[in-house]
Amino acid sequence: DQNNWAGKYPNDWNNYTKLMKDAAAAYQLALRWKLSETDGAQYADAAVAILNDWAKTCTGFIVNDKGEFIDPNEFLIFIQVHQIANAAEIMRSYPGWQEADFVKFKAWIADVFYPHITKFLSTHNGNECALHYWLNWDLSAMTALLSIGILADDNFKINEAIQYFKFGIGSGNIGNGVP
């Protein structure tokens, strides 16, 4: 969030670029560990360090007094949410990731991202035409929602993503996305 990062990264106060790079790194490191023919603990430890750092440092988004993103392009951060959630899902079986840290990460990803994801899918940023946003906007939100649900073992969130795919109001609905 801006309070944590504005001084350190004045040109990236919303952390989008940091999350993009860190999510990709955590995912690649997790894969490298999981597919390693040797121990690969150095890859696992590096992935876990990235995941733990985000859960400890990032406290949320900068929003206006209505709880809305200042820049609507911040909805695109959902593209990285599924990637970092999938990295955590791979790492959940790593014995070196402390259970308390894993629990904290699950709570963090759900608390920080889920409210914005579900709000976007239900309101499309207040746009009168739910189809205003192209398919990729809904798909990134749906995959983020599904990934959070799977990571958190939360059937409500998993079903919310599936139900949106089947019956949602926007382009992510299969009937709207593939006419």
Q: PLM features: residue spans?
A:
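Low-complexity, Ser/Thr/Pro/Gly-enriched N-terminal "stalk/linker" regions
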Residues: 1-12
